[in-house]
A protein has these predicted regions:
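Glycine-rich phosphate/adenosyl-contacting loop at the front of the ribokinase-like
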Residues: 1-62, 67-74, 78, 249-252, ...
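Conserved phosphate-binding/catalytic region of the ribokinase-like
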Residues: 1-4, 204-320
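Cofactor-binding loop segments of dinucleotide-utilizing enzymes, especially the Rossmann-like FAD-
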Residues: 9, 61-65, 88, 101-103, ...
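Short, conserved phosphate/pyrophosphate- and ester-handling motifs at nucleotide-, phospho-/glycolipid
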Residues: 48, 191, 259-260
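A glycine-rich helix N-cap at a beta->alpha junction
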Residues: 75-91
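Conserved phosphate-binding/catalytic loop of the ribokinase/pfkB sugar-kinase fold
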Residues: 85-89, 99-138, 142-143
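Conserved beta-alpha-beta core of the PfkB/ribokinase-like small-molecule kinase fold
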Residues: 137-210, 226-229, 234
Length: 320
């Protein structure tokens, strides 16, 4: 049975590589196309499975009854992800994302959510999915519909599980509207734009203080992109600088999916019994290694992460 269950989107990504982004009304040639599996839920599940091994990570989501779904299931199984928690619907197409990527690795994403919107709260109460949630020590929440998020967070806490949440676009709803979810979250993993949307604050400590009024035990983890990451909770503040890819002879190719690689590695490290700081350092390294790969789901294998582990950036810890 799995150590981690991930609840989130499964998409088919069409990556369009261009020299630069077009202006409105302008046509820009596409240099190459890469069609690859994606979706934040699936990406995080695969990232964790690559580090933990076969059958250690389950994905709970929804696909259409189409060719994309068949490809997705095969790919996920090949990656060692438990797919028994995936629902199929005939009322919507499988999710798809159309991603423009420029020469600097920056991206613009347009998404058809499709079947991802069909995972409902009542689906989580079926015995097949409840058995996955009961078996897991960590539940990672990503981007199902709001009602399903609330139900998932509640069930996870009911079972006494560690809950991690990448709030993503839900952060625009604000902390007050999301407080029923936040009360059940142990680790909130978001970026700078999302923390501002969620709390109205750009200062990480002030943002955590606002969140702690809802949940005193919450740990805020900020993904800072090319500046590394940081973590704040009741006990400590910690920051991890970026990995110097140039020193390793590596370069940025595609930043799409690096946050998913980060979260998957953090969850996997915690599931292995590692502490917050070591898990944060490993997650930071995994995210950095992902940007050197062109595919959305380019998270490192266990062997790759271990090979570069000695080059990981070390955390600076401030005890409060």
């Amino acid at each position: 049975m799995p150590k981690i269950s991930v609840i989130g989107a499964i998409n088919w990504d069409i990556n369009l590589f261009v020299e630069r982004f077009p202006r409105i009304g302008e046509e820009v040639p596409v240099e190459r196309i890469m069609r690859v599996p994606g979706g934040k839920g699936a990406n995080v599940a695969v990232a964790a499975a690559r580090l933990l091994g076969h059958g250690q990570v389950a994905l709970i989501g929804c696909l259409g009854r189409d060719d994309i779904a068949e490809r997705q299931i095969k790919i996920l199984k090949d990656e060692g992800v438990d797919v028994s928690g995936i629902k199929f619907t005939g009322s919507a197409e499988s999710g798809q994302a159309y991603i423009l990527i420029d020469d600097e690795g920056r991206n613009i994403i347009n998404t058809l959510f499709g079947a991802n919107l069909e995972l409902k709260p009542e689906d989580l109460r079926c015995e097949r999915i409840l058995s996955l949630l009961r078996a897991s020590s960590i539940i990672v929440l990503i981007d199902p519909i709001l009602e399903t998020l609330m139900a998932a967070a509640s069930i996870a806490k009911e079972y006494g599980k560690i809950v991690m949440w990448d709030a993503g676009v839900r952060s625009t709803l604000g902390a007050e509207r999301l407080k029923e979810i936040l009360r059940n979250v142990d680790y909130l993993v978001i970026n700078e734009v999302e923390v501002k949307n969620l709390t109205g604050e750009t200062n990480p400590l002030e943002a955590w203080r606002i969140l702690s009024e809802i949940n005193q035990q919450i740990t805020l983890i900020l993904k800072l992109g090319e500046r590394g990451c940081s973590m704040i909770n009741r006990r400590i503040m910690a920051s991890v600088p970026p990995v110097n890819l140039e020193e390793l002879g590596l370069k940025v190719v595609n930043t799409v999916g690096c946050g998913d690689s980060f979260l998957g590695a953090f969850a996997a490290s915690k599931a292995q019994g590692l502490g917050d700081i070591e898990s944060l350092e490993r997650a930071n390294l995994a995210g950095a290694l992902k940007v050197t790969r062109p595919e959305t789901r380019g998270s490192p294998s266990r062997e790759m992460l271990e090979r570069y582990l000695k080059f990981r950036a070390k955390a600076r810890i401030i005890r409060r």
